[in-house]
Amino acid sequence: MQLSQNLKRHRFPLSIISQAVWLYHRFNHSYRDIQEQLAFRGIILSHETVREWCLKFANHFKNVIKKRERKPSDKWHLDEMTVKINGEPFILWRAVDSEGIELDVFLQKRRNKKAAIRFLSRLLRSYPSPRVIVTDKLKSYNKPIKYMCAKTKHRSHKGLNNRGENAHQPTRRKEKCLIKFKSAQGVQRLLSLMGKVRNIFAVDVGRYKKKASDRRLAFAAAQAIWLEAAQGLNSI
């Protein structure tokens, strides 16, 4: 798909805007890193312009990818990690399926039963109850899963949840690249799209698991989804 050149009320063409948003959410780049990469191509803009594009268009890209990505498996891994935002601790709840597809991330202040209920409610609004949910030994999961997913088998064992724990690694790398996270709303927006981009460009492409021809086909399919979302920016 070829992108139309112009985006209403914007000075730069759609192809540049969509690439800048993709670079920020696909790789461990800061806004200034992307500014420099584009400058190497002769595209002169400020890092604030890149930031504004990401803030404005992230939710649109996330929603389009969510509609087009493949359905998750019937086995989910739920896990939490602590992130600091301006020095204040927050709990990031994350759910992935057995193949590494990220279902959702949700930033909260607590790691208690109420927080688990809110997270499960978000998941179940988007996906049917799975066959199995794997968690660590956090007791906050026990009753919410029992009553909200009555037919789901709950496996609570730290050693079984490596898939969930490994899913946090891209977040840690991005956090290190940015030095620190600065706002809860910004982190939620950033990580929500990062997960969806990773689903189609990393998990589905399978950089280390598939032969080159299959990777190229999978990348082309992921790119088609991204360009479709980019073309829809004119309707916002």
State where each predicted segment sits:
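Residue-level recognition of single "structural anchor" positions
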Residues: 1-236
